[in-house]
């Protein structure tokens, strides 16, 4: 089937290990309910009708993915990821076919809301550079003194946002910006930072703060609570 300008391919970098979780199992393969975190994250993407394919970049030699139902899903493509997130995303982009726009979503961010995703996807009609889901900073922010656990000063939180995923960009633009940034040794912490490095200004689309990334052991119980609450709300 030919791809239309409205069709979107999602890329999920899932080659990381997540040492802060303090488990032998990579965090994306930990379970919440009867599914892994990765499955929750991918199913949230596929629930939107514009997302026609999901490319998952896994670590070479990963034996866990093949045991999941996702391995046989007709809309899933699997590629080998790289040592760094940006390498995995580039590998995913190369497998994204002729999709004009791509979503990049964290493998360990299972609590994505469909209305947030829908608002983000409207950027393909209104923006040339795309944007990201993000949440305004509401806590008081402190900057530490270099090398010390001591407060240097309070940071003005006005205009500060927590970057979330998915992040949504024209495929060719993201590919070119990631390639240039990596070739020039820039520090790339997310896909938006590659566009920033190349002089672009992606938009911020406000999303829910409960769209958390499972990073530490305590995040697992919190994500389970959020998912259970969401399922209950959708069924009532």
UniProtKB/Swiss-Prot annotation:
Site location (Transition state stabilizer): 20, 27
GO molecular function, one term: 2-C-methyl-D-erythritol 4-phosphate cytidylyltransferase activity
Keywords, in A-Z order: Isoprene biosynthesis, Nucleotidyltransferase, Transferase
Stored Pfam families: IspD
Gene3D superfamilies named among the record's database cross-references: Spore Coat Polysaccharide Biosynthesis Protein SpsA, Chain A
Top-level taxon: Bacteria
Catalysed reaction, written as an equation: 2-C-methyl-D-erythritol 4-phosphate + CTP + H(+) = 4-CDP-2-C-methyl-D-erythritol + diphosphate
Pathway given in the UniProt record: Isoprenoid biosynthesis; isopentenyl diphosphate biosynthesis via DXP pathway; isopentenyl diphosphate from 1-deoxy-D-xylulose 5-phosphate: step 2/6
Annotated site location: Positions MEP for the nucleophilic attack: 157, 213
Record-linked CDD domains: CDP-ME_synthetase (cd02516)
Keyword Membrane among UniProt keywords: no
N-terminal signal peptide: none
E.C. numbers: 2.7.7.60
A biological-process GO annotation: isopentenyl diphosphate biosynthetic process, methylerythritol 4-phosphate pathway
Job of this protein: Catalyzes the formation of 4-diphosphocytidyl-2-C-methyl-D-erythritol from CTP and 2-C-methyl-D-erythritol 4-phosphate (MEP).
Subunit and partners: Homodimer.
Family to which this protein belongs: Belongs to the IspD/TarI cytidylyltransferase family. IspD subfamily.
Protein name (database record): 2-C-methyl-D-erythritol 4-phosphate cytidylyltransferase
């Amino acid at each position: 089937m030919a791809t239309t300008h409205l069709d979107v391919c999602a890329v999920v970098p899932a080659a990381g290990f997540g040492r802060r979780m303090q488990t032998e199992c990579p965090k994306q393969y930990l379970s919440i309910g009867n599914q892994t975190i990765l499955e929750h994250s991918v199913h949230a993407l596929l629930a939107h009708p514009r997302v026609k394919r999901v490319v998952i970049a896994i670590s070479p030699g990963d034996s866990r993915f093949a045991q999941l139902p996702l391995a046989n899903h007709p809309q899933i493509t699997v590629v080998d990821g790289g040592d760094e997130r940006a390498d995995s995303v580039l590998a995913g982009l190369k497998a994204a076919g002729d999709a004009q726009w791509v979503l990049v979503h964290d493998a360990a961010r299972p609590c994505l809301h469909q209305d947030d995703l829908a608002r983000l996807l409207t950027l393909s009609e209104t923006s040339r550079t795309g944007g990201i889901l993000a949440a305004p900073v509401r806590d008081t922010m402190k900057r530490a003194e270099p090398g010390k656990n001591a407060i240097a000063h309070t940071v003005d939180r006005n205009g500060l946002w927590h970057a979330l995923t998915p992040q949504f960009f024209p495929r060719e633009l993201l590919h070119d910006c990631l390639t240039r940034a990596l070739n020039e040794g820039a520090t790339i912490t997310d896909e938006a930072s590659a566009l920033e490095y190349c002089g672009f200004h992606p938009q911020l689309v406000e999303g829910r703060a409960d769209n958390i990334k499972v990073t530490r052991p305590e995040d697992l119980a919190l994500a389970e609570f959020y998912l259970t609450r969401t399922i209950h709300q959708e069924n009532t």
